[in-house]
């Protein structure tokens, strides 16, 4: 059932869920219930699979997912569920930025650009640098923004092919590469807790461009969490295996 109660009045939603439940009990049916409505999924489903950009990031019994969500995206989804209790307030630590283009997803963990708990191996790249700079520009004066934006240039410059795996290059639109490097160093110093910087092995100017070397990216795998009935695809729970290491292992088999 794909979004069977989406955009319906609450009374109609309840009737449809009640009918589906009756049919399940009377006929022994099994449903694949696709929805963005986690509240109804909690009521209706025995097991839940949370997906992001078409990939399952966490799956397990419904009670286990709701009582102790593991994946940062699952946590964010559950915080966003409306709560009628005014003492709980509104969730303000929801994922930053926009959902990426599914046809060109981020490398490594596709959720990492928006994740508050991202780690060095999550798959950092130059597009993430652009997002961090855009966040910076919400905090500075209009004059400083205009000056820095002239140096950085258009967003498309951050989408250039990597000169080599795990290495990004950015040429300044105006000014010098040293100016661009100074801007990046200033941002790293002003916000050292930003997850991106934990994934940067080094950055330097060669006079023409700034080159940034990122820590080897690893694609998380959906694996069981020890001591639970849940499987999660997240480096916070399983040791990252960089793509280069996986490729080397495959060649030796």
Predicted feature residues:
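Charged, flexible cofactor/metal-binding loops and thiol motifs
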Residues: 61-233, 237-251
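P-loop NTP-binding/switch modules centered on Walker-like glycine-rich loops
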Residues: 3-4, 8-90
């Amino acid at each position: 059932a794909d979004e069977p109660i989406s955009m319906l009045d609450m009374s109609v939603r309840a009737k449809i869920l009640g009918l589906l439940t009756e049919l399940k009990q009377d006929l022994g049916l099994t449903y694949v219930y696709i929805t963005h409505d986690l509240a109804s999924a909690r009521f209706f489903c025995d097991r839940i699979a949370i997906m992001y950009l078409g990939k399952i990031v966490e799956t397990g019994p419904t009670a286990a997912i709701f009582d102790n969500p593991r994946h940062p995206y699952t946590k964010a989804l559950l915080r966003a569920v409306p709560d009628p209790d005014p003492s709980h307030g509104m969730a303000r630590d929801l994922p930053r930025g926009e959902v990426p283009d599914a046809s060109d997803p981020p490398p490594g963990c596709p959720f990492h650009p928006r994740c508050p708990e991202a780690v060095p191996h999550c798959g950092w790249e130059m597009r993430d640098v652009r997002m961090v700079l855009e966040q910076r520009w919400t905090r500075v004066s209009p004059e400083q923004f205009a000056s820095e934006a002239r140096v950085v240039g258009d967003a498309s410059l951050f989408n250039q092919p990597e000169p080599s795996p795990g290495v990004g290059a950015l040429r300044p639109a105006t000014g010098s590469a040293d100016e661009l490097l100074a801007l990046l160093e200033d941002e790293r110093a002003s916000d050292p807790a930003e997850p991106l910087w934990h994934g940067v092995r080094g950055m330097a100017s060669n006079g023409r461009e700034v080159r940034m070397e990122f820590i080897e990216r690893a694609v998380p795998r959906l694996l069981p969490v020890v001591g639970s009935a849940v499987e999660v695809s997240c480096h916070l729970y399983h040791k990252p295996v960089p793509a280069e290491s996986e490729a080397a292992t495959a060649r030796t088999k």
